[in-house]
Amino acid sequence: MTYNYSKLLGRMREKNITQEILAKKIGLQPPTLSQKLNNKAKFKQAEISNICDVLDIDAKEIGGYFFAH
């Protein structure tokens, strides 16, 4: 199953956070984050939680950012 991360990418732009910066803040290598954003690998629950903390995403909005088709 593939997910559409355009809303997540938009939030990153709003916060002026690049993929490289986000990867470092959540403890991933930039290529690993890129693979996840391109549906080549899946996000782990802890990674989703950490991304929400960094980007100030409310728990009620997680579905729209991580599980949209």
Features from the language model and the residues they span:
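DNA major-groove recognition helix of helix-turn-helix
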Residues: 37, 47, 66
